[in-house]
Amino acid sequence: MVRVSGSGKELKRICWLIVAGLLSACTPAPEFTDAAGQTVTLDHFAGKPLLVNYFAPWCAPCLREMPHLNALATEGEIAVVAINYDPTTPAELDKLAAQYHIKVPLLIANEDARLPFPRPSGLPTSYLLDSEGKLKQTLVGELGQSQIDALKASIRHPGN
């Protein structure tokens, strides 16, 4: 018999932490549905920072910030997706994009998706993920140009 220092409870806790870490590493990426009805995961946007924006067509601040999000996505430094907060269909996403001139990919979150961020309690809410998919910032409220500029600076100079 080999004696190991530390209590049995402590070793058991360490083993459970290891198992939990392994299980979370094996959790599939959350799935979304795009306007074409295709399945999309956040892994599709890996390799560059990603701004995930929750919006709704009835939310005036959400619609006011869309031109800023369109411009940010066009610049290409940060990928941008917008998730409709309300249940909807791919056809309705297409209508929204046309009606409000939304150029960023519009997605529907599957209800059972395990997201790397909480479902927002208010709109608009945006989540900035780094190039590895880790949550870096949560931004609640309408994004104006000054917030967009700060986001870009935080990506260029992490830790500042």
Range-by-range predicted roles:
Residues 48-50, 64-86, 98-99, 150, ...:
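Conserved helix-turn-beta segment immediately C-terminal to the redox Cys motif
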Residues 98-131:
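Short, internal strand/loop/helix patches
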Residues 60, 87-91, 143-146:
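Short alpha-helical
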Residues 125-160:
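Thiol-/selenol-based redox modules, centered on thioredoxin-like
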Residues 21-43:
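N-terminal "domain-start" segment that seeds a small globular fold
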Residues 78-90, 102-111:
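Thiol-based oxidoreductase modules, predominantly thioredoxin-like and allied folds used
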Residues 42-63:
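Short active-site neighborhood of thiol/selenol oxidoreductases, capturing the structured segment around
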Residues 1-26:
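Sec-dependent bacterial lipoprotein signal peptides
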